[in-house]
Amino acid sequence: MDVTHLGHACLLVETDRVRLLIDPGTLSSGFADLRDLDAVLVTHEHPDHVDDAGVRALLASNPGATLVLDELTGARFADLDAVRVAHPGETLDLGERVDVLGGTHAPVYGDVPGCPNLAYLVGDGELLHPGDSLHVPQRPVHTLAVPIDGPWLKLAEAVDYVKTVRPESYLPIHEGELTDPAKYAGMLAAFTGP
């Protein structure tokens, strides 16, 4: 499995059977020209995870692709044919097994309303993309896409998340608003070990 980070929370996941794009949002780049996608997976409704116009253009350029998202976000794309509303606990066959986990966005602050948030476990635990949550799966994970910044997250929580999930490796994501993402990734590495 090859995973390419396209900025912020956007990942291109490629296997010998499938090409999946996760969270093509407004803080990501390089996804507009992608072709031969099998599915576009969105974790939740926030624009840094789903650029509505960009996703519509992407689907027009990838007519065989399925858009997978939660019910709330799905309402914005109800006019499209290839939309699949997913729910936690489901297992999808998108050419590769994708387990839908999670359920709720991590709390942001005070009375800021929450929203649905799906986490996606691709393959047999090869990659977990939690969206804006710190969802701990019930089985081993090879590569964890770990958020390192956001109004809902402290770096200490990211460290605890890595230590709890215990992936073989991790990929820092959700860094699009940082001025020096490498600094935060370095601090995460220092606290979690090699």
Role assignments for model-derived ranges:
Residues L134-P194:
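Cap/insert and terminal regions of metallo-dependent hydrolase folds
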Residues V18, S61-T66, V165-S169, G193:
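A short helix->loop->beta-strand "cap" motif at the edges of active sites that frequently abuts
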Residues T26-L69, H142-A145:
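Active-site metal-binding motif and surrounding structural segment of the metallo-beta-lactamase
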Residues T26-L27, E45-P47, L72-T73, H87-T91, ...:
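Short, acidic/turn-prone active-site loops that include or flank metal/cofactor-
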Residues V55-A106, G186-A189:
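Portal/gating segments that form or line small-molecule/metal binding sites
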Residues F31-A32, D51-A53, F77-L80, R139-P140, ...:
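Short glycine-/acidic-enriched loop or helix-start segments at secondary-structure transitions
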Residues M1-R35, V85-P140, W152-E157:
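Core dinuclear metal-dependent hydrolase active-site scaffold
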Residues T4, L41, V68, R84, ...:
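Hydrophobic/aromatic beta-strand patches that form the interior of the parallel beta-sheet core
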